Amino acid sequence: MKKYISVLTIMIMIFLAACSNQNTSSAPTSNENNTQSNSITKLDEGVWPANEYTEGLPVAPGTVECAALDTEHENCNINLTGISENNYNEYMELLNQEGFSVIENVSEEIEGENYVSIGTLLSNDEKWLSISYIPNSLTIYISFDNN
């Protein structure tokens, strides 16, 4: 279980880094540590991405706030807003109907915030989904590998 929580945390961190609103200079720099990977493509906001990762997935409810495709790490991340817990539960049922099985499900009450954070790892033997839900926000990490 700890492994899945660690994997979920890493995937969310990668997604948040890919979707951050960073201003990067196009001017060359001599600092090699200051380079941005060309493998991450920011996808259109407000539109459910259509690619090999999302193919066969039901379109999630809510509004796509940010989405990114990382060709180096072979994954796609989608962050949606306007999601209720009922929307989340309905989407999980749609994924189940599409052949996805829950591998791990973790929920945690966020102290002092009066809500529950839910993390779910699913697979259909072809794709792996890591889904994180907090009120009003759903993040989906999609890969073809469980690492």
Protein language model regions, located:
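An acidic-aromatic pocket/loop used at catalytic or ligand-binding sites
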Residues: 20-147
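Positively charged n-region of N-terminal signal peptides that target proteins for export
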Residues: 1-4
